[in-house]
Amino acid sequence: TSTTLVKCACEPCLCNVDPSKAIDRNGLYYCCEACADGHTGGSKGCGHTGCNC
């Protein structure tokens, strides 16, 4: 079984996510809450290796 990955909708994020496991906000897929919330409150990064969004 192959899974189709999509890029996280957070523009600077480098992560690819499985839509069935991603955070869905208004039809856009995000890798984590920080990205889905637009990094409000000064949150930086998603915590995934190699990504500095």
Swiss-Prot record:
InterPro entries per record: Metalthion_dom_sf, Metalthion_fam14_prok
Gene3D superfamilies the record matches: 2.30.170.10
DNA repair is among the record's keywords: no
The keyword DNA damage belongs to this UniProt entry's keyword annotation: no
Gene Ontology molecular function terms on file: metal ion binding
Pfam families membership: Metallothio_Pro
Classification via SUPFAM superfamilies: Metallothionein (SSF57868)
Alphabetical UniProt keywords: Cadmium, Copper, Metal-binding, Metal-thiolate cluster, Zinc
The family this protein is said to belong to: Belongs to the metallothionein superfamily. Type 14 family.
Function: This protein complexes cadmium, zinc and copper.
UniProt-recorded name of the protein: Metallothionein
Organism, scientific name: Synechococcus sp
